Structure formats: C-alpha cells, structure tokens
Design a protein with these regions (language model features):
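Bacterial Sec-dependent N-terminal signal peptides
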Residues: 1-32
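Domain-level detector for secreted/extracellular nuclease and nuclease-toxin modules, and
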Residues: 22-284
C-alpha cells in the first residue's frame, strides 16, 4: 500500500501561492493559509441540520471546545470537529465521568437518551473522546452531551476505534506552540447503504455502519493530511491502523462531506489528493 502513496507534506516556501487571507479563529489568528476556521467541514445546511460550537474559558481566554453539524431528524451529529494545539492538548484533568446529559444548545426532544444505548446493545460512544478534551473540567464535561454520542458496539468502541483515538491523541499532544492538529470525526448517517440499522426500528435513530476521521496537521510551516475509514463491526478487518488509512479525497467520495474547505484552494487540493503513512509516526 505504501508504495502507491505519495508524500503530501507540503512546505509553504515551496508553494507558488500567494496567501492573503487569514484564519479567523479566536484560538489562533496568526496563520495565513485559510479563509475561515480550518477544522470545519462544509455545512450541509439541511432543514433539520443545526450548527453548534461549544466554548470554554481557559486561562482567561475563550477557547473552542468542539463544533458539530447535528441532524435533528436523526438525533445524531453528522460530524464533530476540534483541534489539538498548545492549549487544548493539555492534560490537566482526568475523565470526569459526569452523568451523560442533554446538550443545552439543542432541544432535548431532538436528542437520544440512555434507553437508546445500553438496552439496545450499544455503548454511548464519544465522537469527541473524553480523552481528547482534558485541558479543563468544563470542557471534559461537555464531551458527555448526548449530541456527542453515537451508538457503538462495545468491541468496536473499546477496540480498533479506541486504538485510533489513542494514536490521534498522541499526535495531537506532540504539538508545540507553532503546531496544530485539526480533527474531524463522525459516523455515517446519510446514505442508506452506510447505515447498520436503527435503534428499535426507529428511522430517527440510525446506527452508523462506518466511522471515520479526517486529520490535518500543521507543523511549523509544513502540512500533512490523512483520513481513516472503519466498518462498525465486532470483528475488525485488521488490528493495524495503517490498513484503514486513505486520502481526504477518498473519504470525501465515501461520505459526501467536503473536509477542510477553508484552506487556500491550491493547498487544499494538494493535501487532500494523497497521503503518506510514513509521515505519521507510529502508523507503520
């Protein structure tokens, strides 16, 4: 597989691009390679779709916890997006084990409840993992909102998916003051052939058949990108994360979601077309 992949680490000084826009993000406004918040995919903006961003105050600053596009008709997030940087990578608290609760930003009638999980044979699987947000108690508690939950089989949730989450956290926590890892996670809820089933045969409660991640790493003035696509199964096809890797373009084809659309077009096109597993420590 690796022989067929091209390296996509791109150094800005080698790109014949004039960067004139700036990243409009309160967490990091010193970048000039994007026209908006980098981690956000393009919104579908359907009649039942709601865009939500949760924030916390950390060290006296307003910090983005995570963002989501939530489909009220399916009681499930289409995706969750967040970042690891010099602030948000910090591990100042442990898992809160706060009671799972309704997201105050969305009407509770549009959210799932405990009975939709355990009694149906599914874990309340975090999309933005508890271990992704450990820089404050408040942000960790936000990860327990039901809008951040997805019905996952226990062997998947505590198996290959957990392994991938741990690897991504390792990459994210390697960030220095000039680095950022942008992360998008989700489960498939839009295409019928990508739905595993429905909780209690209720069409408003789909169970994703696949889960994915899209990653963009800015390290100094260089960039790299990679994606992962996993079938939601009790038995993984492989225990090696490298076997689930693909390009961002390939993930977009599968999901119908446009990832990292706020990047400068030339940079986006180059990064998303290819990937290199060798560029990601611990993957091979």
């Amino acid at each position: 597989m690796a022989d067929q992949m091209k390296c996509n680490i791109i150094v800005l000084s080698l790109l014949c691009i004039s960067f004139c826009a700036c990243d409009k993000d309160e967490n990091n406004n010193s970048n000039n390679f994007a026209t908006g918040i980098v981690e956000l995919p393009a919104l579908r903006n359907g009649a039942n779709d709601v865009f939500v961003t949760h924030y916390t105050t950390f060290n006296g600053q307003k910090v983005t916890s995570f963002s989501m596009e939530y489909d009220k008709s399916k009681k499930h997030s289409r995706w969750i997006a967040f970042r690891f940087d010099n602030q948000t990578k910090q591990q100042n608290v442990s898992r809160s084990d706060e009671p799972f609760d309704a997201d105050p930003a969305i009407g509770s009638q549009y959210q799932r409840v405990q009975a939709d999980f355990g009694k149906q044979g599914y874990d309340r699987g975090h999309l933005c993992a508890s271990a992704d947000r450990l820089y404050s108690r408040e942000v960790n508690e936000q990860t327990f909102y039901y809008t951040n939950m997805s019905p996952q089989r226990n062997k998947f949730n505590t198996g290959i998916w957990l392994t991938l989450e741990g690897q991504v956290q390792s990459w994210g926590r390697s960030c220095t003051s000039s680095d950022t890892l942008y992360v998008v996670k989700g489960g498939t809820i839009d295409k019928e052939d990508q739905i595993r089933g429905y909780i209690s045969n209720d069409l408003s409660k789909p169970i994703p058949k696949y889960y994915y991640m899209a990653l963009l790493f800015k390290k100094g003035d260089s960039f790299k990108a990679i994606a992962f696509w996993m079938e939601h199964s009790d038995t993984p096809k492989s225990t090696k994360l490298v076997d689930y890797a693909l390009s961002i373009d390939e993930l977009e084809e599968k999901t119908g979601i446009d990832f990292f659309p706020n990047l400068n077009d030339n940079l986006e096109n180059a990064l998303e077309a290819t990937y290199s597993t060798k560029a990601w420590p611990g993957l091979e």
